[in-house]
């Protein structure tokens, strides 16, 4: 059975803060940070935005792009590490907002930055089994980094929704296969009640990101009998600009393959939306017949790899909703004081 992406939608808040502004507060070297991270500014949610509102906006764009009846959606899964409620699903909010309720199932996913792609895989399973007609998978976050912590320079806000189906005439992209690589690696964590996550610093690199991304990618390539040169585009989880660039080189992918989907320099790390944002940006540009190789990463730790082929339908649906490039243009820049207010870093009680 053929399973794939019927539609997709993204959302990025319009507010931005530059690396220079954060560095100014903490006395850090902005140029060294920009060169090391390959990130120059990051998205900031508005005061009334959270992972749920971002997920709703992304889902609405996916529905506008698809043109399908929302009552056909049998499952809504939202992946995030910043769900607004500890007990109250984000996914029911999204489902109600897009008109998919009540004859459907919903659940929230957590797996650090790959919760969104885990939701995609779950939807693939439900759709493939015939249990549901369509499944909506979302990755959305308003990620947090403690003041002056390295994460504060990249932790951003944004989300992407993917409508998964099996009707070949509706598919804008076919998901040929997927492969996951998972271990218990404590590279990044946040306990209940902690306002900010903690991490292992450099430990998040080799034993975390690179081990899982490269093994996940190699596993799928071997499973398919494919090579990097078989693909027109490649997307890897984007905690910064340096890591996906290095991972691509390690695996044999070129700079030309990853550049179209490399959005992190302009918006930062959208966590659960990160890899999906790269896929969305690539779908915005890809032609029918193009192949996309994507690998998401989530701390804790694991990776999900996907092989995707774009269909003719992409040309029909692409411009029905804002593209990623349209969403990130014309930003509104704010200073650290306003950023702290937007991010809830100023606590009065």
Swiss-Prot record:
Its EC number is 2.3.3.10. It is an enzyme of class 2 (transferase). CoA binds at residues 202, 242. It comes from the Archaea. (3S)-3-hydroxy-3-methylglutaryl-CoA binds at residues 29-30, 113, 154, 204, 237, 246, 269, 299. The active site is at 81 (proton donor/acceptor), 113 (acyl-thioester intermediate), 237 (proton donor/acceptor). Gene3D superfamilies: 3.40.47.10. It catalyses: acetoacetyl-CoA + acetyl-CoA + H2O = (3S)-3-hydroxy-3-methylglutaryl-CoA + CoA + H(+). One of its GO terms (molecular function) is hydroxymethylglutaryl-CoA synthase activity. Pfam families: ACP_syn_III_C. Keywords: Acyltransferase, Isoprene biosynthesis, Transferase. The keyword Zinc does not apply. InterPro entries: ACP_syn_III_C, HMG_CoA_Synthase, Thiolase-like. One of its GO terms (biological process) is farnesyl diphosphate biosynthetic process, mevalonate pathway. Pathway: Metabolic intermediate biosynthesis; (R)-mevalonate biosynthesis; (R)-mevalonate from acetyl-CoA: step 2/3. Catalyzes the condensation of acetyl-CoA with acetoacetyl-CoA to form 3-hydroxy-3-methylglutaryl-CoA (HMG-CoA). Functions in the mevalonate (MVA) pathway leading to isopentenyl diphosphate (IPP), a key precursor for the biosynthesis of isoprenoid compounds that are building blocks of archaeal membrane lipids. NCBIfam families: HMG_CoA_syn_Arc, PRK04262.1. Belongs to the thiolase-like superfamily. Archaeal HMG-CoA synthase family. HAMAP family: HMG_CoA_synth_arch. Interacts with acetoacetyl-CoA thiolase that catalyzes the precedent step in the pathway and with a DUF35 protein. The acetoacetyl-CoA thiolase/HMG-CoA synthase complex channels the intermediate via a fused CoA-binding site, which allows for efficient coupling of the endergonic thiolase reaction with the exergonic HMGCS reaction. This is Hydroxymethylglutaryl-CoA synthase. It comes from Methanosarcina mazei (strain ATCC BAA-159 / DSM 3647 / Goe1 / Go1 / JCM 11833 / OCM 88).
């Amino acid at each position: 059975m053929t399973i794939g992406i019927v539609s997709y939608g993204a959302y990025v808040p319009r507010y931005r803060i530059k690396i220079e502004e954060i560095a100014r507060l903490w006395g850090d070297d902005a140029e060294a940070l920009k060169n090391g991270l390959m990130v120059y500014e990051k998205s900031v949610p508005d005061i009334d935005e959270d992972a749920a509102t971002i997920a709703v906006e992304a889902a609405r764009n996916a529905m506008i792009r698809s043109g399908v009846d929302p009552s056909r959606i049998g499952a809504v899964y939202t992946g995030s590490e910043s769900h607004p409620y500890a007990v109250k699903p984000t996914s029911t909010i999204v489902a109600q907002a897009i008109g998919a309720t009540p004859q459907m199932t919903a659940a929230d996913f957590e797996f650090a930055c790959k919760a969104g792609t885990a939701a995609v895989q779950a939807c693939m399973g439900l759709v493939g089994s015939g249990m549901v007609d369509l499944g909506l998978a979302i990755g959305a976050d308003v990620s947090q980094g403690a003041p002056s912590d390295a994460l504060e320079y990249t932790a951003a806000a944004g989300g992407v929704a993917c409508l998964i189906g099996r009707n070949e005439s509706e598919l804008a992209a076919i998901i040929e296969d997927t492969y996951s690589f998972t271990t218990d690696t404590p590279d990044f964590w946040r306990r209940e009640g902690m306002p900010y996550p903690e991490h292992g610093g450099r430990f998040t690199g080799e034993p975390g990101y690179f081990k899982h991304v490269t093994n996940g990618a190699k596993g799928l390539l071997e499973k398919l009998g494919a090579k990097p040169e078989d693909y027109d585009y490649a997307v890897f989880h984007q905690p910064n600009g340096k890591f996906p660039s290095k991972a691509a080189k390690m695996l044999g992918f070129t700079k030309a393959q990853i550049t179209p989907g490399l959005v992190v320099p302009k918006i930062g790390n959208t966590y659960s939306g990160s890899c999906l944002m790269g896929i969305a940006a690539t779908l915005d540009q890809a032609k029918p017949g193009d192949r996309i190789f994507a690998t998401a990463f989530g701390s804790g730790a694991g990776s999900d790899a996907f092989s995707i082929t774009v269909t003719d339908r992409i040309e029909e649906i692409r411009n029905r909703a804002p593209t990623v490039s349209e969403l990130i243009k014309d930003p509104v820049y704010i200073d650290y004081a306003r950023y702290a207010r937007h991010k809830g870093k100023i606590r009065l009680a």
